[in-house]
UniProtKB/Swiss-Prot annotation:
It comes from Caenorhabditis elegans. It is found in: Membrane. One of its GO terms (cellular component) is membrane. The keyword Signal applies. This is Putative sodium/calcium exchanger 7. It is a multi-pass membrane protein. Disulfide bonds: none annotated. Keywords: Antiport, Calcium, Calcium transport, Ion transport, Membrane, Signal, Sodium, Sodium transport, Transmembrane, Transmembrane helix, Transport. Residues 1-23 form the signal peptide. It holds the Pfam family Na_Ca_ex. It comes from the Eukaryota. The lineage of its organism: Eukaryota, Metazoa, Ecdysozoa, Nematoda, Chromadorea. InterPro entries: CaCA_antiporter, NaCa_Exmemb, NCX_ion-bd_dom_sf. Belongs to the Ca(2+):cation antiporter (CaCA) (TC 2.A.19) family.
Amino acid sequence: MAQPSILFSLTLIFLISIKSCDAKYRTSFFKTPNCSIYPDAEKCELNKTWTQEQVCDYVNCNDNACEGGGYLLWTQYVECASSTFSRVILIIVGVIYMLVLFIMVSSAADDFFSPSISSIVAHLRISESVAGVTFMAFGNGAPDVFGSIASVLSSPTPKADLALGELFGGGLFVTTMVVSTIILTSPFDVEVFSTIRDLLFYLVALSFLAFCFVFYNRVTLWMPLTFLGLYLLYVITVIGAQAVHNRKRKALQKQNSTKSRKSIKSLRSRKSIHSVAPMPVIPEIEVHDQEAPFPEISVVTGAIDKLKEHMAEKAQTTRRYTKRASFMVNGDGNLNGLHPYATHNHLGISRRESELSDEDEEFVVIHGHVFQGHEARSRAASLVPEPMQIKSWRSKDILKDLAEHLDPRPEAEDWEEMNIFSKVMAYINVVPNLLFKLTIPLNEMSWSKPLTLLHAFTCPAFLLFSIQFFLETPFSGSPGLWVYGLAVSIVLAILIMVFTELSVQPKYYKEIYSYSGFIMSIAWIYLISSEVVNVVTMLGVVSRVSHEVLGLTILAWSNSIGDLIADVSVVKQGYPRMAMAAAIGGPLFNLLMGFGLPFTIAKLQGKYISMTINPTYRLLILFLAISLLATLIGIPVQKFRLQRPHAAVLISIYIAFIVFVILSETGVLVWN
């Protein structure tokens, strides 16, 4: 177990040394540039007449504009290379590095981020739609929002169009390509109110920004404050709608219980009058309501119990459960629905009534599988091994326990089901998975006190490292923030040592690991996204593609890869409505907070923020509005079920946008 720790430590030291020794690096490996002839640039714009040495000096002097904010300075590496061969090799290595990062962010989203989201949603007992526009939106949008904050606060004279360009570009990509991917993966019935609500809020925010660009040439304080207020109104609307939904659900439950009692009384009455032979005992399902308890509900036939037994047997071999295959209860133990045949044919509950409760069905994700319905938690928990019985710290079981929890290889059962491509990806992902397990608490694993102690030190350190605050000093004469992080780690370690036992799982272990795993997953996604942006920025500088086109295309794609991976992962788990809510609510969150928060801070700092709109951004706002209107109109046209033809429409809109941008950049399309 020493080797993984050494590998992780060396990786951290290497990356930190690269970042902290940035200034020394320029003087050691390259000729010290004369930055006085290269004033601070807001965009990385290279003159075609410059020599390679001048280009190298320029990118060294303007690393804030020519780099993406990650640790590895790819633009400097390539532009300051000693030969063309070295440049080509560095570009190839950079592309390979970016592909590995894509694999890493996919693993982080699928294996760590999604399970944490699922557990948090189950713990808070919130619906798919609320989860999509809060936790998933924050998780997906963290790189974009933090990127917007960094770009605005790092410049003495920030420009609104540059900061919003990537937010708009990412929003268009998500509302067209990501939404279409969700639909192609699994056509689904739309959660009408929440989806239309999100689309309308998005259109209002977009219209307000267009108004500001047309009638103002600078940002004033009331503009970002309006966006923050709009987001607050949005959150209130979401919570209010959920409260109304819960009241309707409880009223429906009482109505259904009354119908059930009447049906049972009628059935027993007919039995006592007309029965000739003894009737078989009718299996019963007892349901309790906290506010209004009602008598037991008997199902007319034994089909439900047989189906439940069959699904339980199937679960022992496949660990998969059909979404509506069993009797379902929500977190409070209330009746949500029965098997469709029993529900519709025997209890007289309409399809619309049964769908009313679908949104609140309890679900738990364990080891990549969704468990939903009655006893979802107990079924899921059955897959989580019990804590290893470790008698003392001197036991060899300590190392064995750590080895099992940190094992980066896929489980034997999953390995047998993989195809060749998946196995290759699994091999590539061995080292990233080890790093993830060292720094991301995973609530699917059994309790391990040694691992928890290790996380107490690795998580605070990596959190500071991921946001590049590891060596920052909060005030003059203060040590780096890593010292304060170490102090926090020591306190956590003492608490763990005193208040937990080796072989007994603490009471709130799952909840704490879910929330901390959520935060650390976001930290990894943010770090990986920054590194991807660095490589993409290098490709743009090398190819001399304009900043606008780069931001609206390649940067938008790379920044949105987390949205695509996370949303598709949720769809495959059987929750397309949550993914749809995140696909619309995520970019909406990014726009409202990505404009509202950083520009409010910048205006409070007294900065002047210009607002100009060029032809490329006009196209972007236009096509983003078209994509939102297409979905808004397409929902009722398709009878509230998004199907594959709608995905084709969204893809066509995005392709048309790319074509118009190319025509505008090449001068074929001229704006008056």
